């Protein structure tokens, strides 16, 4: 039976998360608005969930439930404002019953009752025009309520390169987008959170050593920092040549190598397993794996061996001269025998 490594699926406070959560916390405490962009696979969703849970723990349960930081994922392929509103109601634990025209104003009241201080929209690059208009209407209503209830807003997007999602929308000359742009933070309206340097990769590897120490008594990942950094800045994983390492491929490389080493009951990860895991992420990432029953694979292997053996046993084809000699009659037989 193959040994299976117990994997860690919790939150790791990486340098990227410190930078990213710092912006979210600023929006929460100062009620500021930001458009935040980071590369896919950098760990945005994990950071949002951790800060949301931390804010709820700090608020406590005295006086009922409170959600200081309310986070939702932008609805895909549904541009209606009701789609985003239903997700906000669901995050508050309220079912989507009744007409949206009635639940819409119920949502305004619930945001105040549950003490929501900051809205975070993950995958905000998928927001439609009705979604953005609804967010402005929602925040306007709460700001003019009595007592006033200003909300922070973080639109978290995924992107690469120099482009900033949603910026072209807010740069339009219509009054609606001028008002939206005016509410963005004056110092940090658009923020790009970068991933990890080589030194920060070393810090993450040290943290992973502590996490997986019970399974690997002699685990020493930090000695492979240079090699791992080189592998993970391969042009296929870093097409922008930023020299930064994303958390997702880093965790995939390390955990894959640890799984293989653990299956062989090794006390430390081996360089061969690390190199093979790096090749899976780069050179062999587009390889198609054939998944089939074990018996079928064995039968196919046996058939291939039999076919190769039969080909080797086949006599070699004779040349033209040998064939002509076979056709010639022997000296004992007449060339044209007469019929009896």
Model-assigned labels for residue ranges:
Residues 70-73, 137-227, 306:
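The catalytic "switch" region of P-loop NTPases
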Residues 69-97:
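Conserved NTP-binding/hydrolysis module of P-loop NTPases
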Residues 54-64, 94, 143:
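Post-Walker A helix-loop "phosphate-sensing" segment adjacent to the P-loop in P-loop NTPases
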Residues 110-131:
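Conserved P-loop NTPase "ATPase switch" module shared by AAA+ and STAND
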């Amino acid at each position: 039976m193959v040994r299976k490594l117990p994997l860690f699926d919790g939150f790791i406070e990486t340098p990227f998360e410190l930078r990213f959560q710092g912006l979210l916390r600023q929006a929460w405490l100062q009620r500021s608005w930001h458009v935040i962009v980071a590369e896919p696979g950098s760990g945005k969703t994990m950071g949002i969930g951790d800060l949301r849970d931390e804010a709820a723990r700090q608020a406590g349960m005295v006086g009922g439930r409170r959600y200081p930081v309310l986070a939702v994922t932008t609805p895909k392929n549904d541009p209606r404002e009701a789609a985003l509103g239903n997700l906000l109601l669901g995050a508050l634990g309220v079912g989507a019953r009744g007409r949206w025209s009635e639940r819409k104003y119920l949502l305004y009241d619930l945001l105040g009752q549950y003490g929501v201080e900051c809205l975070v929209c993950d995958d905000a690059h998928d927001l439609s025009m009705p979604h953005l208009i609804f967010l402005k209407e929602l925040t306007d209503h709460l700001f003019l309520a009595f007592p006033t209830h200003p909300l922070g807003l973080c639109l978290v997007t995924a992107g690469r390169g120099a482009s900033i999602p949603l910026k072209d929308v807010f740069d339009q000359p219509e009054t609606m987008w001028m008002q939206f742009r005016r509410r963005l933070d004056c110092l940090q309206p658009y923020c790009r959170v970068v991933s990890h340097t080589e030194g920060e990769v070393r810090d993450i590897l040290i943290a992973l050593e502590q996490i997986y120490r019970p399974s690997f008594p002699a685990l020493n990942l930090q000695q492979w920092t240079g090699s791992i950094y080189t592998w993970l800045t391969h042009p296929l994983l870093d097409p922008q040549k930023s020299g930064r390492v994303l958390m997702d491929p880093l965790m995939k490389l390390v955990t894959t190598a640890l799984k293989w080493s653990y299956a062989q009951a090794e006390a430390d990860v081996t360089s061969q397993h690390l190199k093979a895991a790096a090749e899976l992420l780069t050179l062999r990432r587009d390889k198609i794996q054939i998944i089939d029953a074990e018996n079928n694979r064995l039968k196919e292997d046996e058939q291939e061996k039999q076919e190769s053996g039969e080909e080797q046993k086949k006599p070699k084809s004779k040349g033209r001269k040998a064939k002509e000699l076979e056709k010639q009659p022997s000296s004992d037989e007449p060339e044209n025998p007469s019929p009896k």
